[in-house]
Structures are given as C-alpha cells and as structure tokens.
Amino acid sequence: DWKKTTFTHRSGLMLKAASLLRENREKYAHTITLEMGKPIAEARAEVDKCAGACQFFAEFSEGFLADEFVVTEAGKSLILYQPTGAILAIMPWNFPFWQVIRFAAPVLMAGNVGLLKHAPNVTGCSLLLENIFLEAGFPEGVFQSLVMGNHLAETVIQSDTVQGIA
C-alpha cells in the first residue's frame, strides 16, 4: 500500500524520477515543443525545472510533513499529516511538464496517489510523465494519466475514489 511506504523509499524513487528527467531531457523537450509549440530552449528549461523540483521534494518532504507539537489555547496540540488518498489534477497545456510535476512530486511524497487529467493537446506529455514515474519504480497506479475528453472530467471528480482536486 503506497501510503504505508517510508519517506526513504519514496525519496529514492523521486530522485530516480529526477535523474530520468535529466537523462532524457531532449526527448521530453522535443515532445513539449512538438505538442504545444514551446520553443525548444524553453522546453529544455521546463524539464530542468521539473528535475529540480523532484529532487527538492525528495530531499525535504519528510521535514515538511513531520509531526509537530504546538502550544495552543488547549495546551499542547499535535499537528499530524496523513495521506489523503487519490488526488486529481486537471492541468492546462501551457506548461505540460511543470504544472504536473509541481502537483505530483509533493502529492506522491506525502503518500497520496496522483491522477492526471491533462489538456487534450498534450496527451504525449501526459503519457511520458506517467512513464517517468513507472520507470523510476513507482508502483503501477500510484500516478496515472487519464486520457479522456474534457466532458468526462466531472465523472471522475464525482467518483468516490477521488479524495481531493488540485
């Protein structure tokens, strides 16, 4: 069960995703340029930014999500972070990798599952992102690209599976 995995395990996988982004930068940048017309230099920069974000969340998520005791009017209180479940992201086309990674990296590091409904004109980017997480070693289903028309998004939103929307 994904939510029961350790931060150390999740961090290792997220660092692998960062490595894959760096290693395959040209392939991913080319797909971004082909699908949505972004200049190749900007597409490369977007992929680089995504790799950096994966590394950042791999290194710092455990600290961000650590249990915290705070003094309140009630005395001493505990802030406890727990996985929510499946989180759906409905993303635009203009930053087809960055918008997704800035959602997926913290969601997955927190022990949640990420569901992506990307813009229809960047389906290739959507599927590449799913493959990056799979190739990095994330279990199948932990990050899923939902390739479907915009009109079906409401059905997914209303699903009992979805516990949050980004």
List where the protein language model places each region.
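Rossmann-like NAD(P) dinucleotide-binding subdomain of oxidoreductase/dehydrogenase enzymes
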Residues: 66-166
